[in-house]
């Protein structure tokens, strides 16, 4: 489980991006923050937390205390309905991360993600009910091939650029999100990880693929896009629905606008009724390339 990295980014950003802008910055009541995902062939994973006050000092203790426990979460694929069970794992930083997933004691009701399937989630927590829907679309847009080239205008000869050739099927409305994994690292999403097909509808095209970033660490803005000779690179390309696209498009815009006094306030577009966050389905394809030293 590597979702603790995404969880930290999500709960911090949702806590700040939803703050109302006014002159009297009072403390706000915590809201439920939901990060729920399901991928083809994988079990659902749901992380529940409480949002922070705008002026909170983020610490390991604050993060550890933000998880929401003992929620009743049910997930339906239209045929089966399963109730998820709460688990935890301990990160290398000794932080316990709590999440909900398949109940291993009731596998008869359990299911994993599948293409072309709609999912309905119901959350009951602290006397309130929250609902959301998502879908795993067909694996419509695919990566045909990967290769690498020397990083242009870079004096470091060990730096390379990943290049992908992809095909977009005819018809608007194909949305994607991508991640990269380098060697033993986890998958990280791109700085701008979501795209639509408004310009490239129905075409086969090539493009440079930026390296994914860990938003919980300082990012070298001049070099983060590059990979290195000797790297084993895995590209994860996922087809997503419109609501998942809208969430990450607005979330990433908000992330990149933090600290910019000239940017317009942006409301992150979630799809959880009554709460912050999102429930997203992913139709995933994986391709790996080894860059020689």
Regions picked out by a protein language model, each given a short descriptive name:
Residues 1-4, 18-19:
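Positively charged n-region of N-terminal signal peptides that target proteins for export
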Residues 18-293:
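A sequence/structural signal for flexible, mid-protein segments enriched
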Residues 13-16:
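C-terminal motif of bacterial Sec signal peptides marking the signal peptidase cleavage site
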Residues 5-9:
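Sec-dependent signal peptide hydrophobic core
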């Amino acid at each position: 489980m590597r979702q603790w990295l995404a969880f930290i980014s999500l709960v911090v950003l949702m806590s700040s991006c939803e703050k109302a802008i006014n002159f009297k910055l009072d403390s706000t009541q915590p809201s439920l923050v939901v990060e729920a995902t399901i991928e083809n062939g994988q079990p659902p994973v749901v992380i529940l937390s409480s949002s922070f006050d705008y002026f909170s000092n983020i610490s390991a203790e604050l993060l550890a205390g933000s998880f929401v426990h003992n929620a009743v979460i049910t997930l339906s694929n239209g045929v089966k309905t399963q109730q998820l069970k709460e688990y935890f794992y301990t990160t290398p930083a000794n932080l316990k991360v709590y999440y909900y997933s398949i109940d291993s004691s009731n596998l008869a009701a359990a299911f994993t993600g599948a293409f072309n399937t709609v999912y309905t989630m119901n959350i009951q927590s602290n006397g309130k009910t929250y609902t959301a829907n998502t879908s795993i679309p067909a694996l419509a847009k695919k990566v045909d091939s990967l290769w690498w080239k020397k990083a242009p205008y870079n004096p470091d000869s060990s730096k390379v650029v990943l290049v992908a050739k992809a095909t977009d099927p005819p018809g608007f409305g194909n949305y994607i999100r991508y991640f990269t994994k380098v060697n033993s690292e986890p998958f990280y999403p791109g700085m701008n990880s979501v795209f639509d097909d408004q310009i490239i509808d129905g075409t086969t095209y090539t493009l440079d693929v930026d390296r994914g970033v860990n938003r919980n660490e300082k990012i070298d803005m001049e070099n983060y896009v590059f990979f290195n000779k000797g790297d084993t690179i895995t590209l994860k390309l996922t087809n997503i629905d419109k609501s998942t696209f809208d969430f990450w498009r607005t979330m990433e815009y908000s992330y990149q606008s933090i600290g910019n006094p000239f940017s317009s306030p942006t409301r992150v577009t979630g799809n959880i009724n009554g709460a912050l966050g999102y429930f997203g389905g992913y139709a995933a394809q994986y391709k790996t390339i080894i860059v020689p030293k």
